[in-house]
Amino acid sequence: MGKIGVYGSSFDPVTNVHLWTASTIAHRAKLDKVFFLPCANGRIDKQMKTSNEHRWEMLKLAIGGNPLFEVSDYEINERAGTSKQYTWYTMEYFKSRFPKDEVYFIMGADLLEDIDNQELPVHLRWKFREKLIANHKFIVMARDGIDMLKIISKSPLLRNYDDGNTFHLIDKGLSMEISSTYIRDEFAMGGEPRYLLPDQCYQYIVDNKLYQKALNS
């Protein structure tokens, strides 16, 4: 049985921190493969600045030569045209694709807080959260100022599955932050973010004149 991580984000663009985070998580959680899952344009909860094709190409360039990493087109192709790209569907897809392996959804502690946030109306919490938590596993990355154990203890749903198997908490060494928004803004202002993302991606952005206009972030 292998161990697989699914790392979803807009990757607009992919940064060195995305790659470092994936590598660190793979090492600590002993993953055999990490799938980078770019979000599709058209999602109701995310506004992408570049096309699916550009973000796909940058990811392929970024991970080239690393057998641990792979890019998945599940959201940008198989669920293209739908705004309801819920995590439940994504995890069911990967679980069906790798039925003999353990599949983990990789997320930050901020998303853990959102799954069953008791301060939000029920209809604003994650869709299908009960069966998502009951049937899947998660690797949760620490975020500054967020107490992951407290989040779990405050949610009846999360607390019910706090069995040492559902949630793999990584609470140290992942606090470095370089946001894609910052890199986009640097490009828009004529800055030089060359060393914040892979060389091939930097050159791709320059060649294709991406992120050239002032952005509202």
Residues covered by each model-derived region:
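Nucleotidyltransferase catalytic core that binds NTPs
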Residues: 1-217
